[in-house]
UniProtKB/Swiss-Prot annotation:
Encoded by the cryptic lambdoid prophage DLP12. This is Uncharacterized HTH-type transcriptional regulator YbcM. Keywords: DNA-binding, Transcription, Transcription regulation. It comes from the Bacteria. One of its GO terms (molecular function) is transcription cis-regulatory region binding. The keyword DNA-binding applies. GO terms for biological process: DNA damage response; response to antibiotic. Disulfide bonds: none annotated. InterPro entries: Homeodomain-like_sf, HTH_AraC.
Length: 265
């Protein structure tokens, strides 16, 4: 069963009034982005994609994206749907992907009436605090409306069993905790040397994962809440606001205040 208390499934709204650019954004969970107004330009690896309110964007974990958001008539409005790995793995067990489609890459699809209907139903269930099982059932409808093969290829690119994914899930549960490699290794029931060795084999370091989680989680909070930036910094493990601003700017090439400024009319 999927439902074991509170789900990680969530929908967040991004509302901006000025053009802005954010570098090296790395989704911490598989996500869908529905543009409601304006357009988004996405760059990753050697690809560039421009998306408006006629398409849905599929963001898999494991990629870094360079993003520009452009308002239309003074407003950029988008909704992000974050999907827990458990739910997607259950979807994969229920619906089979074909190898022929698995190897194709496309990070956007046209919106369709089924998708819009299922999305609105899911959004209502989340806003009203409906049960976890109901939310997961409606999320399955959203995934089905995209097409089984697209979901499997684009949203299942990150295995729950990978050490990176396990570290993401652990750190994201309490990003403000004073995490060390030793503490994470104890939680995962492995030695710290094994942790470092296996992360290196997956092409990352412990510090890079910790930075990914804290900075991308902070970015989401800055875009979707009105919390003070200093509070967001503390919640993500940064006691010094100026240090947080420096790390944030080095990562995203934009400061927290510049993002907040873009959100004001």
């Amino acid at each position: 069963m999927l439902a074991r208390g509170k789900t990680n499934l969530k929908i967040e709204e991004i509302r901006m009034h000025k053009h802005h650019e954010i570098h090296r954004v790395k989704p911490l969970m598989p996500a869908l982005c529905r543009i409601r107004q304006g357009k988004k330009v996405i760059n990753w690896e050697t690809h560039t994609l421009t998306v408006d309110n006629n398409q849905i964007i599929l963001f898999p974990c494991g990629y870094e994206f360079y993003i520009e958001n452009y308002p239309e008539a003074g407003l950029y409005l988008a909704e992000m749907l974050y999907l827990p790995i458990d739910l997607i793995e259950s979807f994969q067990k229920l619906y089979t992907v074909t190898d022929q489609i698995r190897n194709k890459t496309s990070f956007f699809l046209p919106q369709n009436p089924e998708l819009i209907y299922c999305w609105e139903q899911l959004k209502t269930s989340v806003s009203r605090g409906f049960s976890t099982k109901i939310q997961e059932h409606l999320a399955m409808g959203v995934l089905l409306s995209l097409g089984v093969n697209h979901v499997n290829h684009l949203l299942l690119s990150y295995s729950k069993q990978s050490l990176i994914s396990r570290c993401y899930n652990l750190l994201l549960s309490e990003p403000g905790t004073k995490w060390t490699a030793n503490k994470v290794a104890r939680y995962l029931y492995i030695s710290v040397s094994t942790l470092h060795r296996r992360l290196a084999s997956e092409g990352v370091s412990f510090q890079s994962i910790l930075d990914d989680v804290r900075l991308n989680n902070a970015l989401s909070a800055i875009q979707t809440t009105v919390k003070p930036i200093s509070e967001i910094a503390r919640e993500n493990g940064y006691k010094c606001p100026s240090r947080f601003t420096e790390r944030f700017h080095n990562r995203f090439n934009i400061t927290p205040r510049e993002i907040r400024k873009a959100s004001r009319e």
